[in-house]
Curated annotation (Swiss-Prot):
Subcellular location: Cytoplasm
Catalytic activity: tRNA(Arg) + L-arginine + ATP = L-arginyl-tRNA(Arg) + AMP + diphosphate
PANTHER family referenced in this protein's UniProt entry, alphabetically: ARGININE--TRNA LIGASE, CYTOPLASMIC, ARGINYL-TRNA SYNTHETASE
Protein name: Arginine--tRNA ligase
Subunit structure: Monomer.
Gene: argS
MF annotations from Gene Ontology: arginine-tRNA ligase activity; ATP binding
Top-level taxonomic group: Bacteria
KW Iron (keyword) present: no
Amino acid sequence: MLAAQKQRITELFQAAVAPLVAGTELNPTVTLERPRDPSHGDVACNLAMQIAKPLKKNPREVAQVLVAALLDNPANRDLIESAEIAGPGFINLRLTPASRQSVVKTVLQQGAQYGKSNLGAGKKVIIEFVSANPTGPLHVGHGRQGALGDAMSSLFDAQGYAVTREFYYNDAGVQIATLATSVQARARGLKPGAEGWPESAYNGDYIQDIANDFLAKKTVSASDGLPVTASGDIDDIESIRAFAVAYLRREQDLDLQAFGVKFDNYYLESSLYNDGKVAATVDALIKADKTYELDGALWLRTTDYRDDKDRVMKKSDGTYTYFVPDVAYHTVKWQRGFTQAINVQGSDHHGTIARVRAGLQALDIGIPQGYPDYVLHKMVTVMRNGEEVKISKRAGSYVTLRDLIEWSNGETVEGQERDLTRGRDAVRFFLISRKADTEFVFDVDVALSQSDENPVYYVQYAHARICSVLAQWTDGDEAALLDVDLSPLTAPREAALLAKLAEYPEALQRALEELGPHQVAFYLRDLAAELHSYYNAERVLVDDVALKMARLTLMHATRQVLRNGLALIGVSAPARM
């Protein structure tokens, strides 16, 4: 059901119910839903049951009055074909064939804009995701964040929000110091396990690569950073630290580039300290009397803001706990004008939510409760050749995102330049194909298979099938399809496909409301299923010219919606498979 149709039906119900509630305090809300069973019609409404009890009337009798008024209203204008009363008082409506078919022309007229809206009206939204420590290659968990965060950003952008994609670099703290000593040890010729190897050092082969380039006095730079040239002095730990961080930021940039993810801004944790924002945040909380000292540490009264216990802000050794810069960072987000902030993070960050929100509330600068929003994802298990893969030689302790993209890409044809599109498509689609808060098993063998079991192949093949059919139609111009008579589209499979096309804008808005890009993947899988079922049941290029043209137009619209949905989640729409 298209938005314009939904609005018209809502207004018809409002007009029908007005006489029934006149003189009362009732102000019922018209809620329209799509029946789960298509045989029940196109639209379901429970309005009669909402008002029957307060009016002390039988809900079915109320429904009869509403239906009569609905169908008699001149504003109906061939929108509703029939209405039925079901169960205790549900009203099920069937749209006219012309109303169902109108989605095709809407899709063709709007093209890549179909499904988009101005719901956000330019409201500023910042979505932070990946935000990895620059201490190693991106892992599969970062990949899930990348897929979720980028798709979510595209969802908000499609609905008229002013979206900023931000990567927060945790470039301060113990882990960065560990990185520097790990590279220093490798530069001195030490190997993991050898005498003198630092405790808790990073063991991956990438540490040796950094050490080699440091000794060679090479220059590296991240996408938003100044070039950093290695000094080659193995005793200069600060030079090693700066070079190693820049090196790994560049490596992470390359991983994200292969994954098709681009950020609008990079924010360094170290800048919060260098610019005095962390100290200013702590001072503001002290002045507001939201802190106290105990056992040599500074505590924040987070229990005043729904946390289960107060939290240490500054330890007895003078260092800040990890949530303090987070509070400062989100204060900066608010001051930058982002009235909505969304963080996509691993589920291990669950414990930080209450304390960060408590710190923001304690500052009392107008930040609303529940700021920021969090989308937490669970772990990804990787299977390959029927076995779980836990360790990457490159990383030393985990499967990297680059590993997963390359494995899912398949073999390279000798003599051809390696194109990672197939692997990128598979990883991106797979990693948003489940709700973020569910654990996910990524089976590389499934990602490589050309079967219905592979969801990205299944959806892309639907698009390729349509391209093949349209390519066989050699006696016409696609632009002429805008004027085709669609009345011949009366087969049950055609009705199902038309209904699914009309659901696309609703699917996007549902995904936006739930902060759940998986809804887009679900929709695309369902649309592909309807297309495959239709393709197997009905011939498109039939002898009947009117029917052929109507079906070609339906195929063209379906291809457009598949393209729109795939583009939104960063997956290609190949013409051939």
